[in-house]
Amino acid sequence: MELNVLLLLLCLSGGQVGAVEETLMDTRTATAELGWTANPSSGWEEVSGYDENLNTIRTYQVCNVFGPKQNNWLLTTFIPRRGAHRVYVEMRFTVRDCSSLPNVPGSCKETFNLYYYETDSNIENKISTFWNESPYLKVDTIAADESFSQVDFGGRLMKVNTEVRSFGPLTRSGFYLAFQDYGACMSLLSVRVFFKEMPSVVQNLLVFPETMTGAESTSLVIARGTCIPNAEEVDVPIKLYCNGDGEWMVPIGKCTCKAGYEPENHVVCKACPAAMFKANQGMGICAQCPANSRSTSEASPICICRNGYYRADFDTPEAPCTSVPSGPRNVISIVNETAITLEWHPPRETGGRDDVDYNIVCKKCRADRRACSRCDDNVDFVPRQLGLTDTRVFISNLWAHTPYTFETQAVNGVTNKSPFPPQHVSVNITTNQAAPSSVPIMHQVKATMKSITLSWPQQEQPNGIILDYEIRYYEKDHHEFNSSLARSQTNTARRTGGRVWMFMSVQVRARTVAGYGKFSSKCGFQTLTAEDYKSELREQLPLTGSAAAGVVFIVSLVAISIVCSRKRTYSKEAVYSDKLQHYSTGRGSPGMKIYIDPFTYEDPNEAVREFAKEIDVSFVKIEEVIGAGEFGEVYKGRLKLPSKREISVAIKTLKAGYSEKQRRDFLSEASIMGQFDHPNIIRLEGVVTKSRPVMIITEFMENGALDSFLRQNDGQFTVIQLVGMLRGIAAGMKYLSEMNYVHRDLAARNILVNSNLVCKVSDFGLSRYLQDDTSDPTYTSSLGGKIPVRWTAQEAIAYRKFTSASDVWSYGIVMWEVMSYGERPYWTMSNQDVINAIEQDYRLPPPMDCPAALHQLMLDCWQKDRNSRPRLAEIVNTLRPMIRNPASLKTVATIPAVPSQPLLDRSIPDISAFTSVDDWLSAIKMGQYRDNFLSSGFTSLQLVAQMTSEDLLRIGITLAGHQKKILNSIQSMRVQITQSPTSIA
């Protein structure tokens, strides 16, 4: 089966295949009477004759040249069209020269007319109504290139004329041909009716089916192609255009061989043999399996690792399989009281990898070492416990006089693939005596006007018998060098001799035979005020009175703490209450989500936490650089969240050495995007802020920015496809407008396109307030960037008045960019020239072949009065019926000859500067077509100004980009001729 397919593809791909002519009728093959109908009967006559090769043929002849007002009709039989949209008629005939006929009146002719009548049924019952011109459609008047005379006739010199005419479009089941003679002496030797069909073709791993030509000579019929077996699509959908002359144009789209297959002669994808592989789809060839791997079957996309060898998750299929490392060597331990330093040499075998790291396993053991358990979390490892790249680690905060076991593991990228534990080396140590750990907390037991009583719990690691405690006191705002010291044999202390309402800071530390531990953290306490004098008197009363006073004091402390707590809570609530009140004044509908500016938060990080999801950096894989932004590079990568499938993402990074303001500005875009949820708005996946570099992660758009995507595919989309893109952009902007969000930088470069041609609004970097007091003539924004003058409304440039109406103006410019396939608005004009022209009511002209309805919508968006511009919801409602009714887009806009209306293309030179067609073509860099113009008769600029796209095709200019450039110049030429009717060449 595969061999048969291969042979078929090889046959189809051989050489350039031209159109096939499928015959519908051919009188040369007739062996009996043709049976055509003639009227009157004295006109056309069917006879048997001979062609120039003396083959017997059935012909029709007529020669009533001596009678006046001849009107002889000849009607063929019904001809089925067999699905053809356009048919061709090849007529072979001879005509007698009227001047060679003696005494012939002036009614003698040397031409005849060809007509056709399209029908679904036979017309024999109403044949009488067909002997005049009214029911027919005229194809052409046929004239002979050569005629014969009496001398020629006597010498049997046949001067046969061959003419081919075509007509269409055809929609009925079939048609009749009619020949009208009105005074000629001629013979219709043969008539062949045929249509053109493109045969199947294989090009560059693409297969295109048989395709009929279009109904018009300029028609381009799309043939949808498929990939050959074991190939897959790349880029845009596959198609090939068949022109009206039956020629295949350049194919669009691409197929490449699947993983496991390689191309052969560009017509088949052949499976990789055993012991070879191909990992990715593409035009690459199969390769030998990498080291320590093998493939046992054909068409392998990857080679399987041999036993004991593995590939890491991040290894490519082209990478060799590797193994785990051996254990570290020569481990040395240095114990210092309750800390230890471990050092070692790298393993002898790295497993063939260069990503060897080290892990430390800490175990605390009993004195006899018969049982060990994992160390507590408070043990410190410097620089860290896992993923060490150096061969040294410092471990502290261990228990004193305690046996420990430390395992030093060597790991690499495939250790987690092995079923066995990592190779390691163990060392056993016992810590020495050490000073006690610090006191964790202090409590105030009692306070008077001049004294404070304190207590504290025993520390977690006394590391021996506590001999005593040292307490350090100093007043608030005094340096600790001005402190006073006291000692206590217990875990309580009383400070006396203070002042009324004195605030003091207190620290305490314990002492063992190993010395003092560290001082505790500072704790603040204070004596009572004069108003609490009664409390001091109660201290001198019996025990009952003292107890009562203590109860009162404790209650007051609880009350104060409650009041303070409520005050803090109220303060926090008040901040959010103000914020909610501020944002509830928007114009959104009830229940509609309203945009919140992240710059209104006192702490911008709070906005990031509220609107953006934090993503662990281990879930992110960076693959390649795809661009650079204001804050750093942009990458393509992969995101694999738990319990979710892996997806492609775009990753914006914050470059090193950033300031806090740059970090805030960078993350503000995530705070903005995180508030949006719409199919035409770029989706935020999350942010990475807890590691470096800081990242913003969004969905990945395969086709990139809209402007460059359109330029790369110039002329490749239908008007309906372009309007569909515009409707998607408008829907996204409508959503933003309903959230009371103003974009401020809407342009085709800030629209991203995915593989399904869905357009999504992106780049929210300029969408924050501009400085109101700036007087910089370059219109510097608060970001330090420039206002995009070519896309910005008049009031936004002049007064910094950014609204949804100014976004509508920008949307009109985006429409112009889309319909012009990514041309630069206002071409090479300077920003100041653009501003001046707009103020004088100049507007952009319609792009080539732009529907009038779309250009009118652009002009509506560019109304000087912002209140007169359509709302984004109205724009969506305007575009929707255009897609449903493509007929509304057939009327193409033209440039009016009124200077106050659309702006002229300033990049095209003045027509008066040219003296010839040659000069003009050289000026627009199209001099290679000089001979095409001159040989076709377009020898003056006056004639060139009348040319159409059909004329360009006819003279051999087939490249869409060149047609567009020449037609733009011709369009400008017409306007300049109309406005300044001077004499031109």
Curated annotation (Swiss-Prot):
Which GO cellular component term is one of those annotated?
A: dendrite
Q: Which residues are glycosylated?
A: N336, N428, N482
Start and end residues of each Eph LBD domain: 21-203
Q: Identify the residues that bind ATP.
A: I626, G627, A628, G629, E630, F631, G632, E633, V634, K652
User: Where is the protein situated, by its record's location annotation?
Assistant: Cell membrane; Early endosome membrane; Cell projection, Dendrite
SAM domain segment(s): 912-976
- Gene that this sequence comes from: ephb1-a
Member of which family?
A: Belongs to the protein kinase superfamily. Tyr protein kinase family. Ephrin receptor subfamily.
Top-level EC class as recorded in UniProt: transferase
Upper classification of the organism: Eukaryota, Metazoa, Chordata, Craniata, Vertebrata
Q: What is this protein called?
A: Ephrin type-B receptor 1-A
Q: Where is the active site?
A: D745
Q: How does it sit in the membrane?
A: Single-pass type I membrane protein
Q: Which residues lie on this side of the membrane: Cytoplasmic?
A: 564-985
A Pfam family for this UniProt protein? PK_Tyr_Ser-Thr
Q: Which CDD domains match?
A: EphR_LBD_B1, FN3, PTKc_EphR_B, SAM_EPH-B1
